[in-house]
């Protein structure tokens, strides 16, 4: 019997430039449609299609096709996909903290789907620290105005 390494397994499920973003997008909006997601995320049709197929294959999302004209397809999280969201949130918080510590620019659009109250305080603290590193003159002005 060949054993499967759990780290490799989960990494395979979420590897891909857009998979974690897609999962959070679905979690935030409840469901997504292909063209809206392509436009919102700015991802190519080919890449989005492939990522959605892989996420569906791995059981993290479900593709729902409506027999309408024109054809309507939506994607929702499965219970397995929902179970993964807290772990992705932890990775996201770590990543934002790390980017801020490296003083790297953080995509503001990435915050749109990460505004749940349980993480908002952490994100705001990190962003405040990040902004102070980016604009130290704002701290000096703030200190002067409070005196």
Model features per residue range: what roles?
Residues 25, 68-70, 105:
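Conserved beta-strand edge residues that scaffold enzyme active sites
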Residues 2-47:
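N-terminal helix-turn-helix DNA-binding core of bacterial DNA-binding proteins
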Residues 9, 21, 36, 72, ...:
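Amphipathic alpha-helical recognition patches that constitute DNA-binding helices
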Residues 1-2, 57, 62, 79-147:
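C-terminal regulatory/oligomerization modules of transcriptional regulators
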Residues 51:
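Residues within the DNA-recognition helix of helix-turn-helix
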Residues 56-76:
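Beta-hairpin "wing" of winged helix-turn-helix
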């Amino acid at each position: 019997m060949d054993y499967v390494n759990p780290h490799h397994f989960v990494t395979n499920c979420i590897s891909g430039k857009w998979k974690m973003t897609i999962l959070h997008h679905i979690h935030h909006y409840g469901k997504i449609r292909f063209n809206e997601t392509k436009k919102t995320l700015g991802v190519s049709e080919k890449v989005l299609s492939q990522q959605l197929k892989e996420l569906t294959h791995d059981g993290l999302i479900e593709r729902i096709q409506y027999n309408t004209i024109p054809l309507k397809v939506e994607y929702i999280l499965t219970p397995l996909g929902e179970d993964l969201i807290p772990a992705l949130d932890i990775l996201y918080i770590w990543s934002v903290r790390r980017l801020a510590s490296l003083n790297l620019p953080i995509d503001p659009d990435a915050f749109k789907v990460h505004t749940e109250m349980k993480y908002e305080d952490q994100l705001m603290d990190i962003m405040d620290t990040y902004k102070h590193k980016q604009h130290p003159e704002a701290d000096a002005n703030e200190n002067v105005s409070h005196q």
